[in-house]
Amino acid sequence: MAQTLYDKLWNSHVVHTEEDGTALLYIDRQLLHEVTSPQAFEGLKLAQRPVWRISANLAVSDHNVPTTDRSHGIADPVSKLQVDTLDANCDAYGITQFKMNDVRQGIVHIIGPEQGATLPGMTIVCGDSHTSTHGAFGALAHGIGTSEVEHVLATQTLLQKKSKNMLVKVEGQLPRGCTAKDIVLAIIGQIGTAGGTGYAIEFGGSTIRALTMEGRMTVCNMAIEAGARAGMVAVDDTTVEYLKGRPFVPTGAEWDQAVEYWKTFRSDEGAQFDRVVELDAAQIVPQVTWGTSPEMVTSIDGRVPDPEREKDPVKRDAMERALAYMALAPNTPIEAIKVDKIFIGSCTNARIEDIRAAAYVVKKLNRRVAPNVRLAMVVPGSGLVKAQAEREGLDKVFTEAGFEWREPGCSMCLAMNADRLEPGERCASTSNRNFEGRQGQGGRTHLVSPAMAAAAAIEGHFVDIRRLG
C-alpha cells in the first residue's frame, strides 16, 4: 500500500498501539534548552531515574542569553538561573551541550541541523513549538510539553495520536524578490492559522524542491503557525548535500548506507492525502502581516483590509481588535506603514542565507538606516553563522549602514530577554509570531522576509523590494 512521508516516519517508530489509536513512539533525538527543561530534570531527580539514552540528547541555551557583550555574564537573575540550571543538569547527566560562550551555541532549531544532529527518518522532539523546523530534512519533528520532555529523557518514547495527512503543493517559479518566508506566509494567509489543525503537513511541488535547505527550514518552521504540529519535506539530493561532513553525521560505509535509507523518506506514488492545498508560486508577492495573527497577512502592494467588508461577524470583530492594537487604519497602503525597529533573526530567518539576503539589500540601497528607525539589529542564529558572515564581511555591511551586529540567540523574537519592544513601537521582524505583546508589552509586530526587513530599515517604512532589481 502506498504511504505518505508522514506514514513512513510514523510507522517506522511505533513501539506499541493501544485500541484507541494512541501509539507509543520511539524518539531518536531530543533537543533541550533552558526554558522547558529544568522541571523535567527535577522530575528525574525526584524519581531517581537516569537519562535513558544520553547520546540522543543535545542541549543549548538560547531563549535567555544576551545578544550584546557576554563578558560580564547575564544580568537578569531569572535568565541567569535558567541558563545556569541547564549547564548544571547537562554536566550532571553527561548530556552534550553548547554553553553560552561556545562558538557552536545558537538557537536550538538552527544548531541541530547545523551540527547534523537532525537527520532524515528521525523522530525529533523539543520543548518548543517550532521544532517543526527539523521536518525540512524528512523527519517527524514537533514540540512537546515539559512533562513530555521528562518522559523522553526517562524512556526515549512518547505517547501520541496520529495526525491526518495534508499536502501543500506549491508549483512554479518563485518571482524575483520573493522568498521561502513569503511562501509560508502566503500559505498561512490562504488556509488560516487553524487550516492545518489535526494534520501533519508535507510541503511539496517544484517550488519547494527548488528551495535550499535553509528555505525549507523556514517553511517547516511556520507549519505550527498554520495549525499543524509538524511540517516536512521529502528527502532529495539537496538534503543529502547539506548534511555531508557535518559533525553528527555518519561517515565512511555508514554514510553510504544512511543515504540509501534516507532517500526512502518520500511519499510513494499514489499515496493518499486527507487534504491537498495547491498554490501557484507565480502569484506570490512579498508578504507583510498587518494584524495580530500570522493569517492576517497581505502583499506589499496591498492595503490594510477594511473590517466593514468582512461578512463573518467573528472575523470582523477579530480584525477590528487587531487594527486597534496595531494602530492602523483600514485601507492604509502597506508601503505607507512606518517602522520604529527592525529585527533580523530568529529560528525562522537567522541562517547564513537569510543574513546574505538582508546584506544584499543593504548594499544595493547603499544608504544608512532611516532616521526614524530607533534600532535595527541583526542577530545570527548561531556562533558558526556569525563567524561565516564575518568571514564574508557581512557584519561590516550592516554596521557601516547603522545596524547593530549581535551575538546569537532567540533575541527579540519573544520578550524573554533584554531585546524587546517598548509599548507602541512598531517592528519589521523576520520571526514567526505577531501576537499581541510577543516582542514586548504593547509592541506591534509585522512579519516579513529578511530582505523586506532590511529594506524597511533603510527606507523607514515598508517597500516593495521587487523594485530593487
Curated annotation (Swiss-Prot):
Binding annotation for [4Fe-4S] cluster: C347, C410, C413
Subunit note: Heterodimer of LeuC and LeuD.
Coiled coil stretches, renumbered: none
Cofactor comment text: Binds 1 [4Fe-4S] cluster per subunit.
Family indicated by similarity: Belongs to the aconitase/IPM isomerase family. LeuC type 1 subfamily.
Catalytic activity from the UniProt record: (2R,3S)-3-isopropylmalate = (2S)-2-isopropylmalate
Known pathway: Amino-acid biosynthesis; L-leucine biosynthesis; L-leucine from 3-methyl-2-oxobutanoate: step 2/4
NCBIfam families: leuC, PRK05478.1, PRK12466.1
Gene Ontology MF terms in the entry: 3-isopropylmalate dehydratase activity; 4 iron, 4 sulfur cluster binding; metal ion binding
Keyword entries, A-Z: 4Fe-4S, Amino-acid biosynthesis, Branched-chain amino acid biosynthesis, Iron, Iron-sulfur, Leucine biosynthesis, Lyase, Metal-binding
Function: Catalyzes the isomerization between 2-isopropylmalate and 3-isopropylmalate, via the formation of 2-isopropylmaleate.
Enzyme Commission (EC) number: 4.2.1.33
Cross-referenced SUPFAM superfamilies: Aconitase iron-sulfur domain
Gene name in the database record: leuC
Domain of life per record: Bacteria
Species per Swiss-Prot/TrEMBL record: Burkholderia mallei (strain ATCC 23344)
Gene3D superfamilies: Aconitase, domain 3
Signal peptide stretch: none
GO biological process: L-leucine biosynthetic process
Protein name: 3-isopropylmalate dehydratase large subunit
Cofactors that this protein relies on: [4Fe-4S] cluster
